[in-house]
């Protein structure tokens, strides 16, 4: 699991955690709020590991018995709340795993720590049951609520927890991590970074995804030659990408990044801001051929296509209209 120094970004949260541990100002309840893949589980796990570390420093030592237990997921004083229903944490889940066990003192450490992933999936009854525990917890208890949307939690829970908001990580840090740690080439790191939009977990997932590479190659092949396609070829292209229907949002985002590259190069002639660097000759050619108005029309059409697909408008019709707009501009 490592330590806080290995975490990319989130320096403000890490500083807060270290200070809280060093100054013995640990709260009884925290909300870690951020997108899926933003690092909530990692930060909560490192926080828990630090609180239980036998050396008592602001970072886990990764050497003591407690740290090794935490790293392997087998520490008796770290309880990760689970739920059988995929989209719901029930009142029974909270009562059985939290309320009914929290008064049992820690087995070996100074704290007993509860980590509740997807806390925004708690029912109102489950939240009310947890609220009673948060209001009057034993001194040794620390509860971490991990959520993508803290607004779905009761105001009374929000007001009784310390809020730690995970913000987007700088693109330069994500790209550096992908190239140094995952050893992926520059051009691929650029695409994954642009696509991840500040989310390290998403960037890593994309970098390791063969399917994403396939979707990217399909999009690139279409964009390189769409201006030369006949209507029948465009219809065939739409039929071909129906296999990616579940990932069509990703497919459209790739096209959007491509045309932002075209617009950026047309306006500045600068290559360092281009994402699809491995396709620069095609980016240059399309920047030369297309007008500013045409590129803007394509970007607007992409947004319309996304909205229409969300509204369940016929897939083939939406994509054919989009591709014709791209071809004409």
Segments (PLM) and residue ranges:
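Clamp-loader machinery-focused feature within the broader ASCE/P-loop NTPase space
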Residues: 2-125
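Solvent-exposed, charged interface segments at domain starts and junctions
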Residues: 2-3, 118-133, 191-193, 258-259
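Hydrophobic residues in beta-strands of the RecA-like P-loop NTPase core, especially within AAA+ ATPase
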Residues: 32, 116, 130-131, 147
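Conserved catalytic/switch belt of AAA+ P-loop NTPases
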Residues: 128-145
